[in-house]
Design a protein with these regions (language model features):
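A residue-level detector for the "anchor" residue at the start of short, highly conserved motifs
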Residues: 1-173
Length: 173
C-alpha cells in the first residue's frame, strides 16, 4: 500500500507479498518499506522485498545499499548481492545470494536454479492461485533448473515441467 503522493520527510510503503523497487536517491526523504516482519530503509537503490510469511520473508539487494531491521534484532546493512532473511526465532540473518532469479522475476520470469521441486510448485501455486498436492513425496526435494514466463498460462508451465520427463504434473478442476 502506498499513497498517491508522499508527504513529510519520509516515503513509506506497506507490503504484503513481493515487490521490486527502483528508488530514486533523495537523502532528505528516505524510502521505507514496512512489512509484518521487518522494515527496510533506503536512500536510492534497486532491491526486492518478499513478505509472504515469517519463514518466507527477505530483502535482496541488487544495487546500492539498504538497512533492514526489526524489533528482535540489530539492523543489518546490505551490500549488492546480499540478502537479509528471518530465522525461525525472528532474528535477521545476512547471506550472499545469486541475484539473477530476482532480475528475472522483475523481467516477468520464474527462474529456478538448483531449487527443490516443492519450492518451485509452491511458487507456481501462489502465482496461479491454485492448491498443489503431491502424490509422490519422494520427489519433493528433487533439485532442478526451471524457467517459465509469468505471462503464460499454468497449463504452459505444467507442459514444460512434464517435458523434462522426470515426474508428471496433472491439473484437476
Amino acid at each position: 500500500i502506498f499513497p498517491d503522493v508522499f508527504v513529510k520527510e519520509q516515503r513509506i510503503v506497506y507490503l504484503k507479498g513481493e515487490a521490486y523497487f527502483d528508488v530514486a536517491p533523495d537523502k532528505e526523504h528516505p524510502f521505507i518499506v514496512k512489512t509484518d516482519y521487518f522494515e527496510t530503509v533506503v536512500l536510492g537503490t534497486k532491491f526486492n522485498v518478499r513478505s509472504y510469511s515469517k519463514l518466507d520473508a527477505h530483502v535482496t539487494l541488487l544495487e546500492g545499499k539498504v538497512t533492514v531491521a526489526n524489533d528482535m534484532a540489530p539492523a543489518l546493512t546490505l551490500q549488492p548481492e546480499e540478502q537479509a532473511s528471518l530465522t525461525e526465532d525472528g532474528m535477521l540473518r545476512k547471506q550472499a545470494v545469486d541475484i539473477y532469479p530476482y532480475l528475472e522475476w522483475q523481467n516477468g520470469y520464474f527462474y529456478f536454479d538448483n531449487v527443490a521441486l516443492v519450492e518451485i510448485m509452491r511458487e507456481l501455486g501462489r502465482w496461479y492461485n491454485v492448491d498443489v498436492v503431491f502424490e509422490n513425496d519422494e520427489m519433493l526435494d528433487y533439485k532442478m533448473h526451471f524457467v517459465a514466463s509469468r505471462t503464460e498460462s499454468l497449463m504452459y508451465a505444467v507442459r514444460n515441467l512434464n517435458a523434462l520427463g522426470i515426474f508428471y504434473v496433472t491439473l484437476d478442476g
